[in-house]
Amino acid sequence: MALTELKGQTGGTQRVVIERGPVRVFAEALGDTDDVYQQDEAPVPPTFPFVMSYWGSFGTGGAAGLPIERLRGPGRAILHGEQAFEYHRWPEVGDVLEGTTTITDVYEKERSNGGKLEFYVTETAWRDATTQDPVVTAIFTLVINVRPPQPS
């Protein structure tokens, strides 16, 4: 698949209800034992929006409606590159959010061994489902390590 085929692709809109259980489990997995995550109206941990894009996507071959599985193949490994978050307000338990993910940039770098690295930058804009006010934008870079061709 050519890199240019994916740039600008949008994965559609997904709806997420932030529930206390997943927030608590996520905080515990990070080793964050702050009591604030045990409350009924708890805020989410700072990196929690990353996992929201994957809710409901297991077994679908994608995340947030994007064709992640189409990037896999022989000699290709998917790596987590970078992530960042722009908060407009802090999400919390009870929020119902709608997120739209777009691939905003694609590029590649050649490696000295004949392989290459492909970079896919995505942005997921999460909005309040009722007011449509922006809540958080999650920016994520997916890296595909493409091994060099093997001699036959």
Residue ranges and their predicted role:
Residues 1-82, 149-152:
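Hot-dog-fold acyl-thioester-processing enzymes
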Residues 1-2, 82, 87-152:
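HotDog/MaoC-like acyl-thioester-processing domains
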